[in-house]
Each structure stands twice: as structure tokens, then as C-alpha cells.
Swiss-Prot record:
It catalyses: DNA(n) + a 2'-deoxyribonucleoside 5'-triphosphate = DNA(n+1) + diphosphate. The record marks Y14 as: Substrate discrimination. Mg(2+) binds at D9, D105. Monomer. InterPro entries: DNA/RNA_pol_sf (IPR043502), DNA_pol_Y-fam_lit_finger_sf (IPR036775), DNA_pol_Y-fam_little_finger (IPR017961), DNA_polymerase-Y (IPR050116), DNApol_IV (IPR022880), IMS_HHH_1 (IPR053848), Rev_trsase/Diguanyl_cyclase (IPR043128), UmuC (IPR001126). GO terms for biological process: DNA-templated DNA replication; error-prone translesion synthesis; SOS response. It is found in: Cytoplasm. Poorly processive, error-prone DNA polymerase involved in untargeted mutagenesis. Copies undamaged DNA at stalled replication forks, which arise in vivo from mismatched or misaligned primer ends. These misaligned primers can be extended by PolIV. Exhibits no 3'-5' exonuclease (proofreading) activity. May be involved in translesional synthesis, in conjunction with the beta clamp from PolIII. This is DNA polymerase IV.
Length: 402
């Protein structure tokens, strides 16, 4: 089979889940995100009908309401999205055991060797789309290619409900004319650096001297050069999510946050969430990362490694605040905050504690975890969550997992 890799990308996934769950929403402009009553926050997803009005993911709810006054605004419900995603993965595994979830609404599948059972890769894609539509109730675009890179790019070429095949001979014709930002893995900062080298299209990147790219970007330059030619050697890995490298959480704020005091409230809330998930997995971690984005969504990410692994929110918070003070000026507004803990190990041993503080903290965490297990994640919160800067109580904890 020449092009055995498929990428299934659910269209307007969050909004589509709500439409699938509530038939009255079908055909209506559904907008998910923020606080519908107060008209603040950002759009996480928009249905096809809302997108037709100009609504885009990432814009403010207020902007979306102006573009689509008839829009139906809904709060996100991540538990439902996770459930739907799991159902879709189960359908994909009916065709092949080689399924790799890429995000909550995307997954790769390698159908090598499945031809005798299900037909060609295109025939499998048609059957997959039909089953997801009929059994789950959402539409998806499927990209088909010889590798994950081309399958991923193919999936984005025809939305919604598309089916596109990209093979190596298609790269010069269909891929090279595209802006370099369209190449998978190229973000805004990397795009700017490439433009400084007069690289504006993917074709420009493919034709650029490899040695210069390696001098400018190191190993990343080599990978970029390969990607621009449609080359990707990474396999579909069904076990990718089982090897937990880090656990993180991030929140897009409902407004600009100014000054350290406001930002530190959100950082503490995130540390609580992250460390709760770390403990649930039986882990402890050493490397704390803090990610911040400003109002233009230009981002900064910094990390620091501690001397010992921990699952304590207070210890992670202390390091995250140090990173904040060292790398983010107090006058600069913040619109998104993320915290993650990496360098994870199974939490079998505790650091030697001469004064019993670690043991007291461990018992406190265990007690809080038991309360949350029984009564829900937000049955007990830090007092700072009740201040104007707190976001978890109002949002019910709906934020993006890392």
C-alpha cells in the first residue's frame, strides 16, 4: 500500500459534540468558550454555521457575538469531549491496531497490511468517515499520505468533511506554493526567522541550502528541510501517550492580567491542578515549566530543574514564581498562563525530611485528594480562587490539558 497513513481530524470538534448531543443545535451557529452570560473569554470552537459568519477560534467572545448575534454560546464541557474522542479512537482501532492519538480531536492510523480486510487506504478513509458520522455524530476530514507529515497536511486541505490524498509527486505542485507558516511545525516565531532569510513559501524552504539551515537552526534546520520536501520518518506509535513525559495545564484568561499579584493567583491554581494530576498518576517531577502569552499571543516559556522530584503544588509554585519574576516584566500584560511538571518518576521514595514538613504536606495533599475524589475537583479550592483574579471557580476548571 503506497499511502498507508491516515490522519482523522474532527471538524469543529467541541461545537460538533454539542450538536451531536443536542439535536436542536444541528444547523445552528454554536460557539464554545468563555462565559456566555458575561460575554468574556475566547472562542475555543465554532460550528461550521458560526464560521460562516466569520467567527474564528481564538477571537474574543465579544467579537464573536458582534459577528454572529444569533450565535448560541456554550460553556466548554471537556468530559464530554474526552468521551467522544475515546469513542472515535475505538472505531479507528476496528480498522487497525496502529492508532496514535495526536490531540483530543486528531489521530493517526497506519493501515499497512489491512488491504485484504478493508480495501485501499482511500476506501478505508471513506468507511472511517461514514462510521464516525453515523455512530458518533460528528464530521471529520481525513488526510491520506505516505507518512504522518503529508497525511496531516492533507487533512487540512479540505474542510469540513473532506478527504484528501497527498503523495510525494504532489509536494512540488500542492505544498511548495503554500506560505511557510502552513508547514506543520512552523509557528509565528519560526516563521519570522525564516522570513528574515527570505524564505516565504514551503518551496523556498525546500530549495534553501541545507548547510545554511543547519548553521542557523541546528537539528531543527535539518528537520525543516526534510519536511519541506514531504519527508517524515516518524512511525505511527500507539504507545505514545503511555510514556508520560510531562503533565501540564494552561488557561486562556478572560481579560488581560496586569502585575505579578494577579498572575501569581492563576499560577497557584494551575500548580494545584498539575500536581493533583501528577499524584493521581503516581508520579513526582523535577522540571517546572512556566509558559506565558501576552495580548498579541507572543509567548515565552522557561523551565527550571529542582534537586529532587516533587508532587507538591507549593514547591512547584515557588519555582514557577521565580521564573515569572526573572523572565516576565511586571508591566507586561498576560493573556494565557501554563504550568507543567516534567522529569517524571514513579513516586516511591520521599526526600529525607528532618522536620516533618514534607510528611505534613503529603498528608494534607492526600486528604484534599480524597475530598476531590468523592465530591468533585472543585469541592475544595485555595482561598485565592475566590479573589477577582481567580479563574477556576467561575470556569469549573475547564481548561486545556497538556
Amino acid at each position: 500500500m503506497r499511502c498507508p497513513i491516515l490522519l482523522a481530524d474532527m471538524n469543529s470538534f467541541y461545537a460538533s459534540v454539542h450538536q451531536a448531543m443536542e439535536p436542536r443545535l444541528k444547523g445552528k451557529p454554536v460557539i464554545v468558550g468563555g462565559d456566555p452570560a458575561r460575554r468574556h473569554g475566547i472562542v475555543l470552537a465554532a460550528s461550521v454555521e458560526a464560521k460562516a459568519c466569520g467567527v474564528k477560534t481564538g477571537m474574543t467572545v465579544r467579537e464573536a457575538a458582534a459577528l454572529c448575534p444569533q450565535g448560541i454560546f456554550l460553556k466548554p464541557r471537556h468530559s464530554h469531549y474526552i468521551n467522544f474522542s475515546a469513542r472515535i479512537i475505538r472505531i479507528m482501532k476496528d480498522f487497525s491496531p496502529l492508532v496514535e492519538p495526536f490531540s483530543i480531536d486528531e489521530a493517526f492510523m497506519d493501515v499497512s497490511g489491512c488491504g485484504l480486510l478493508f480495501g485501499s487506504s482511500l476506501e478505508i478513509a471513506v468507511k472511517l468517515k461514514a462510521r464516525i458520522k453515523n455512530e458518533v455524530g460528528v464530521l471529520c476530514s481525513v488526510g491520506v499520505g505516505p507518512n504522518k507529515l503529508l497525511a496531516k497536511m492533507a487533512a487540512g486541505m479540505q474542510k469540513p468533511d473532506g478527504l484528501t490524498l497527498l503523495d510525494f509527486p504532489d509536494v512540488p505542485v500542492k505544498i511548495w506554493p503554500l506560505p511557510v507558516r502552513e508547514l506543520f511545525g512552523v509557528g509565528s516565531r519560526l516563521e519570522k526567522r525564516l522570513r528574515d532569510l527570505n524564505i516565504h513559501t514551503i518551496g523556498d524552504l525546500a530549495r534553501y541550502p541545507l548547510q545554511v539551515l543547519k548553521q542557523k537552526f541546528g537539528l531543527v534546520g535539518h528537520i525543516l528541510h526534510l519536511s519541506a520536501s514531504g519527508i517524515d520518518y516518524s512511525p505511527v506509535d500507539p504507545c505514545s501517550l503511555e510514556r508520560v513525559r510531562s503533565i501540564g495545564h494552561q488557561i486562556t484568561l478572560p481579560r488581560d492580567y496586569w502585575g505579578y499579584n494577579e498572575i501569581k493567583v492563576v499560577i497557584l491554581e494551575l500548580c494545584e491542578i498539575v500536581c493533583r494530576r501528577v499524584r493521581l498518576g503516581g508520579y513526582a517531577g523535577r522540571t517546572v515549566s512556566l509558559t506565558l502569552k501576552d495580548t498579541d499571543f507572543l509567548w515565552l516559556s522557561r523551565a527550571r530543574t529542582m534537586n529532587y522530584p516533587t508532587a507538591s503544588a507549593d514547591e512547584v509554585y515557588r519555582v514557577a514564581v521565580q521564573l515569572l519574576h526573572q523572565h516576565w516584566p511586571p508591566w507586561k500584560p498576560v493573556r494565557m498562563v501554563g504550568v507543567s511538571l516534567a522529569g517524571l518518576v514513579k513516586n516511591r521514595a520521599e526526600q529525607l525530611d528532618l522536620f516533618g514538613e514534607a510528611e505534613r504536606a503529603r498528608r494534607l495533599h492526600a486528604a484534599c485528594d480524597r475530598i476531590k475524589d468523592r465530591f468533585g475537583e472543585h469541592s475544595i479550592l485555595r482561598a485565592v480562587s475566590l479573589t477577582p483574579a481567580g479563574v477556576l471557580r467561575e470556569r469549573g476548571g475547564e481548561a486545556k490539558h497538556g
